[in-house]
Regions:
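A short, polar/charged loop-to-alpha-helix boundary motif
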Residues: 58-71
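Residues that line or immediately flank small-molecule/substrate-binding pockets and catalytic motifs
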Residues: 59, 95, 123
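Zinc-dependent deaminase
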Residues: 6-35, 48-51, 77-87, 100-178
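Short, small/polar residue-rich loop motifs at catalytic or cofactor-binding pockets
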Residues: 37-40
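A short, small-residue-rich loop immediately preceding and capping a beta-strand
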Residues: 86-95
């Protein structure tokens, strides 16, 4: 009976993880045709199984999804209350948080500074400059990390980006008719 209860708890947790990741994917889709050559990324911040902030990467060169989710939480609750809510929260994002400064500061820094307890990401970033580095930085800062929730859907969403990063060529679709 105890084992069954533990299995039920894990299954329930898995379903919640999938639900929150599905929402992050839906948010990411809002960036379609606006963020290229960057990937489409969505983010949901959750505290006590409730969404307290959400965001997506809205435009090339603009703030990333994680930062927009934090800003969304601050707009909803005010900065002081939001900072308390974000501390110890879980962050769901369809792609590994960036760990390099390019057009924007690394998202890993903001995640750590805000005291986020756990990061659940759908898949690693295929960009060789990031691939796994964001995860290492978060773990070093004692942030729990879980990878692979709805991984197939997360990779499919950004298949153009993945092809460019992994194969150094554009994503090609061939249509043929007779």
């Amino acid at each position: 009976l105890l084992l069954q209860m533990e299995l039920n708890k894990r299954q329930e947790e898995k379903m919640k993880d999938q639900d929150f990741m599905a929402r992050a994917i839906e948010l990411a889709k809002k960036g379609r045709l606006k963020v290229q050559p960057n990937p489409m990324v969505g983010c949901v911040i959750v505290k006590e199984k409730k969404i307290i902030g959400e965001g997506w990467h809205k435009s090339f060169g603009g703030a990333h999804a994680e930062i927009n989710a934090i800003k969304n939480c601050k707009r909803k609750f005010g900065t002081k209350k939001a900072n308390k809510l974000i501390e110890g929260a879980d962050l769901y994002v369809n792609l590994e948080p960036c760990s390099i400064k390019k057009n924007t500061p690394p998202c890993t820094n903001s995640i750590i500074q805000h005291g986020i307890r756990k990061v659940i990401c759908g898949t690693l970033d295929p960009n060789p400059a990031i691939n796994g580095q964001g995860i290492k930085i978060l773990k070093k800062a004692r942030v729990q990390v879980k990878i692979g929730i709805l991984q197939t859907e997360c990779k499919s969403l950004n298949r153009v980006f993945f092809t460019t990063q992994q194969k150094s060529r554009p994503y090609i679709i061939l249509k043929s008719a007779q």
